[in-house]
């Protein structure tokens, strides 16, 4: 996640440009709604509110500290900014609840939203709070929860998961070559004393990963910490649930944007957007079958990256991959709330 407290968010102007395609589209309502699904410190939301003075921005975040900071930062916009604490795949519940509270116009149910941004992964604000346990450079409790009220911590994973479960997490979520070896070391060391703080884990990783790999593969803790964070916060599950759910809220012409920082996230986004933007007409037919046309089209050619100039100013922009798409057909658009079977 790109938000840097006190600094310009990654690719801010490009995000405004992409979301603006939906806000300014001919199908946008007079009071368009933008969802900033990963609010952080509020930098992208602030850019949207400044750029589109007729729009309402809904900021979602599971981290109450982020919500408090963003609410203070964006108070000057009054009722044009509303926030809600949730995992980002809870967007439908959030929008419904905000409409019930009168903080969003009820017409959003019918018209949908004009754009959204999801800036995935851990925020710079969270990395800069060592007590949260996200950063391996500072000794801190092995927590890693984006929502401090969630039950699962990184320490619990290390102390209670089986060897096979730990190895799977490190391999799948961290692409760690030495996942099995690290898992064996964790199980062996936790029998002596449970894991509590990050420094001990970092020390174990230095001792376990061969020196040659440490010299060429970046910091030895990077992949393990990433994998633990993804497991603690169920990040990939949330993302997989999110994409079809948020897509149903887009009106024709509205634009959705995802910013990814890990290949796992980007692969999930890429696969989903390709499926959404592909016609259901069987290949080989000379015409598009009615009702089988693609609901969406891609608005970026592949994955866009930050410019060299921006990366030079902000190294955290280096890994970002941006993918955007827009609705071109009302075929799959849903009016919420969904009917529930009796």
Curated annotation (Swiss-Prot):
Record family assignment: Belongs to the methyltransferase superfamily. RsmH family.
Main location: cytoplasm
Residues involved in S-adenosyl-L-methionine binding: 42-44, 61, 88, 119, 126
Listed name of the protein: Ribosomal RNA small subunit methyltransferase H
Catalytic activity: cytidine(1402) in 16S rRNA + S-adenosyl-L-methionine = N(4)-methylcytidine(1402) in 16S rRNA + S-adenosyl-L-homocysteine + H(+)
Keyword rRNA-binding found: no
Pfam family, one: Methyltransf_5
InterPro entries documented for this protein: RsmH, SAM-dep_MeTrfase_MraW_recog, SAM-dependent_MTases_sf
Domain of life: Bacteria
Enzyme Commission (EC) number: 2.1.1.199
Job of this protein: Specifically methylates the N4 position of cytidine in position 1402 (C1402) of 16S rRNA.
GO MF term list: rRNA (cytosine-N4-)-methyltransferase activity
Organism expressing this protein natively: Corynebacterium jeikeium (strain K411)
Keyword annotations: Cytoplasm, Methyltransferase, rRNA processing, S-adenosyl-L-methionine, Transferase
GO CC terms of this entry: cytoplasm
Biological process per Gene Ontology, one example term: rRNA base methylation
NCBIfam families, A to Z: 16S rRNA (cytosine(1402)-N(4))-methyltransferase RsmH
UniProt keyword rRNA processing present: yes
Location of the protein in the cell: Cytoplasm
């Amino acid at each position: 996640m790109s938000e840097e407290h006190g600094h310009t968010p990654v690719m801010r102007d490009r995000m405004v440009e992409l979301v603006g395609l939906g806000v300014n589209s001919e199908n946008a309502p007079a009071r368009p709604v933008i969802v900033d699904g990963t609010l952080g410190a509020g930098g992208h939301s602030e850019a949207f509110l400044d750029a589109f003075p007729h729009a309402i921005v809904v900021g979602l975040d599971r981290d109450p500290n982020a919500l408090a900071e963003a609410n203070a930062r964006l108070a000057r916009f009054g009722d044009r900014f509303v926030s809600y604490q949730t995992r980002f795949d809870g967007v439908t519940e959030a929008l419904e609840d905000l409409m019930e509270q009168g903080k969003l116009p009820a017409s959003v149910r019918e018209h949908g939203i004009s754009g959204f941004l999801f800036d995935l992964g851990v925020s710079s604000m969270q990395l800069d709070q060592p007590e949260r346990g996200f950063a391996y450079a500072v000794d801190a409790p092995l927590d890693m929860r984006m929502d401090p009220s969630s039950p699962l911590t990184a320490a619990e994973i290390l102390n209670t998961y089986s060897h096979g479960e730990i190895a799977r997490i490190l391999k799948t979520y961290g692409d760690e070559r030495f996942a099995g070896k690290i898992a064996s070391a964790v199980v062996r060391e936790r029998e002596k004393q449970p894991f509590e703080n990050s420094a001990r884990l970092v020390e174990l990783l230095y001792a376990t990963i061969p020196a040659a790999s440490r010299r060429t593969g970046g910091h030895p803790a990077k992949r393990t910490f990433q994998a633990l964070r993804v497991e603690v916060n169920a990040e990939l599950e949330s993302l997989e649930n999110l994409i079809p759910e948020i897509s149903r809220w887009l009106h024709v012409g509205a634009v959705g944007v995802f910013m990814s920082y890990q290949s796992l996230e980007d692969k999930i986004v890429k696969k989903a957007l390709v499926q959404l933007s592909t016609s259901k007409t069987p290949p080989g037919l000379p015409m598009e079958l009615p009702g089988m046309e693609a609901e969406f089209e891609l608005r970026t050619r592949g994955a866009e990256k930050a410019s060299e100039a921006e990366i030079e100013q902000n190294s955290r922009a280096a890994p970002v991959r941006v993918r955007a798409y827009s609705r071109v057909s009302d075929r799959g658009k849903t009016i919420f709330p969904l009917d529930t079977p009796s």
